[in-house]
Curated annotation (Swiss-Prot):
Protein name: ATP-dependent RNA helicase dbp9
Region (Disordered): 332-380, 580-607
Residues covered by the Helicase C-terminal domain: 243-475
GO molecular function: ATP binding; ATP hydrolysis activity; RNA binding; RNA helicase activity
Motif stretch (DEAD box): 180-183
Protein's organism: Sclerotinia sclerotiorum (strain ATCC 18683 / 1980 / Ss-1)
Chief location bin: nucleus
One example of a Gene Ontology biological process annotation: rRNA processing
Length: 607
């Protein structure tokens, strides 16, 4: 029997071959056959390190506290054993009850977990039912969903606590409880909700805590929910050449926009890119700026409806969009709480010290009152894009605004180089000497960029990673400066506010009024795009085209694709002007008169 070939035309190893080599396979983990079919349908070849370690322990009934890097397959590590135990229980007793509660910090992550459950249960969908409580539906609809006692409930701590208090969510038969992204849950302000859930939960529930870092927040949750858990600190060995290549550029505030223009217009980055900015207004300012050069992008922020945000991520993963501009408000607003002094042995000293430094800086930032009270729209507390969300095949993470902590930086760059792939992280840093030199493009968080960069370099060095300087040929870049200036002046504060209001109105209409229509007509959803033009105050069509004299000689062919224009099949001996002259001369000789039917027509009758 012929074996399938991978992208490098190398035969894919079979499970028998991997088992012979001592590698764990999904079949060797003892999972249900129907789940193995669902795994095969997802084209998973072999379990990752966290999956091979956590799944057997979960099947044994042990509590688990696992730390593994982003993109290492933590979701499947806790879902597969839970689904297996539900299927085995139903073979013995078909009684319907809620067996598993999965708590996540954001709506986007809840939707992702729900879709993962659906994919794994493709061959046992009738036996396992899951409900996502983070959808924007009325309380009556949520009660009706929970009335059937779904096997798995996915919710944020706030939704779970609310429904448990009203007895809509019954936890009496609960056997499994998972907190995904455990180090982020408390920073979203879910302390009281988690304590309430812990009081209502029956004793003896198996608990799994999944996190990318082990911090004091995780220790708090461990003391609240776990009973002598198995602590897994997993560091996967990266193959040579794989992982995230990290670069930094020190530049002025307006040069950020210049470099972004050059990067995308000259196609210096190939593939999909996520651009992180400091606040919502920066999202729209950057989008309006790029639009003037014909570069399309879509926006993710907490003011957009949740359905729109989820749809943007789905379409990005389907390669419909190449550029997402995402605001990371939680990090900028200093939502990382300062760790408590009592650190236990399980909390790593490096992470703990880094967290304390990051939290101090974040608190300094929040203490300073803003000079202007800006009228802001309603933000979604349960929004989060730099953590947990599985963006697929991201080539580059661009930190347009540097985060305020090394922890935030780690999770941002974790959106690329997932599941053994390679990726690039490029960060713009404002030196203190250049801070506030260009006020229209300045942002408050850039004041401490150099301090944060020093912490990032130190933190990455402890992991054996290097943050390298990225050198642009500024002589060639400066040739684009006047075009950047024209575009930047067109993006005024009024244009930003108008664009923000316009897009939020459009997205609300798409999200609420058309939701049912798209459920009934899924083909129409293809035409719903989120990267349409918002139009700045002054449209300058000439900026969309880069003249040849600005293009570098070496890279011109790569940008134009070697296009030399139209080439005719026949040689043209005369040009347009000479042809016109010849025609005019012919008219002068009388040929023009003969060709005029009014002068040559004769009405004589035939004899």
């Amino acid at each position: 029997m012929k074996r399938k070939l991978d992208v490098n035309d190398v035969p894919v190893p079979t499970e028998e071959a991997e088992a012979a080599n001592g590698k764990a396979t999904f079949a060797s983990l003892g999972l249900d056959a129907r789940l193995l079919q669902g795994i095969a349908k997802q084209n998973f070849q072999s379990p990752t390190l966290v999956q091979s370690k956590a799944i057997p322990l979960t099947l044994e009934g042990r509590d688990i506290l696992a730390r593994a890097k982003t993109g290492s397959g933590k979701t499947a590590a806790y879902l597969l054993p839970i689904l297996h135990s539900i299927l085995k229980r139903k073979e013995l007793s078909p009684t319907q009850c809620t067996s598993a509660l999965i708590l996540v910090p954001t709506r986007e992550l809840a939707d992702q977990v729900y879709k993962t459950v659906e994919s794994f249960t493709a061959f046992c969908a009738k036996d396992v039912r899951a409900v996502n409580l983070t959808q924007r539906v009325s309380d009556a609809v949520q009660r009706s969903l929970l009335a059937d006692s779904p096997d798995i409930v996915i919710a944020t701590p706030a939704r779970a606590s609310l429904n448990a208090n009203t007895s809509a969510l019954l936890l009496t038969n609960l056997t499994h409880m998972v907190i995904d992204e455990a180090d982020l849950v408390l920073s979203y302000g879910y302390d009281e909700d988690l304590q309430n859930v812990a009081k209502i939960m029956p004793k003896g529930v198996q608990t799994v805590l999944m996190s990318a870092t082990l911090t004091s927040e995780v220790e708090t949750l461990k003391g609240l929910f776990c009973r002598n858990p198995e602590v897994l600190k997993l560091e996967e060995a990266e193959d040579e050449g794989k992982g995230v290549s990290q670069f930094v550029v020190k530049c002025a505030e307006d040069e950020k926009f210049l470099l972004v223009y050059v990067i995308f217009k000259l196609k210096l980055i190939k593939g999909k890119c996520i651009i992180f900015v400091g606040d919502i207004d920066r999202c729209y300012r950057l989008k309006l700026f790029l639009e003037q050069f014909g570069t399309r992008s879509c926006i993710l922020n907490s003011q957009l409806p949740v359905n729109s945000r989820i749809h943007v991520v789905e379409e990005f993963n389907k390669n419909v969009y190449d550029i997402i501009i995402a605001s990371d408000e939680h990090e900028v607003l200093g939502d990382e709480d300062e760790p408590k002094p009592e650190e236990t042995e399980e909390v790593e000293a490096d992470d703990a010290s880094g967290e304390k430094e990051d939290a101090k800086d974040a608190k300094k930032e929040t203490k300073q009152p803003s000079k202007k009270k800006q009228k802001t729209g309603k933000k979604d507390k349960e929004y989060g894009v730099s953590r947990g969300i599985d963006f697929k095949n991201v080539a580059c993470v661009l930190n347009f605004d540097l985060p305020t902590s090394s922890k935030s930086y780690t999770h941002r760059i974790g959106r690329t180089a997932r599941a053994g792939q390679t990726g690039m992280a490029l960060s713009f840093v404002i030196p203190s000497a250049l801070y506030r030199k260009h006020k229209p493009t300045s942002i408050e968080s850039a004041k401490d960029d150099e301090k944060v960069l020093a912490k990032i370099i130190k933190h990455q060095a402890k992991k054996g990673k290097e943050v390298k300087p990225y050198n642009f040929d500024m002589k060639q870049v400066d040739a684009f400066r006047y075009r950047m200036g024209d575009a930047l002046r067109a993006v005024t504060s009024i244009a930003v506010q108008e664009a923000k209001a316009r897009e939020i109105r459009q997205e609300l209409m798409k999200s609420e009024k058309l939701k049912r229509h798209f459920e009934e007509n899924p083909s129409d959803l293809y035409h719903l795009r989120h990267d349409g033009e918002l139009r700045p105050a002054r449209v300058q069509a000439h900026l969309k085209h880069v003249p040849d004299y600005l293009l570098p000689k070496e890279g011109k062919k790569g940008i134009t694709g070697g296009d030399i224009g139209f080439v005719g099949m026949h040689k043209t001996t005369e040009n347009r002007i000479r042809k016109a002259r010849a025609a005019n001369k012919a008219k002068g000789r009388g040929k023009g008169r003969k060709s005029d039917p009014l002068k040559t027509f004769k009405a004589k009758s035939r004899k």
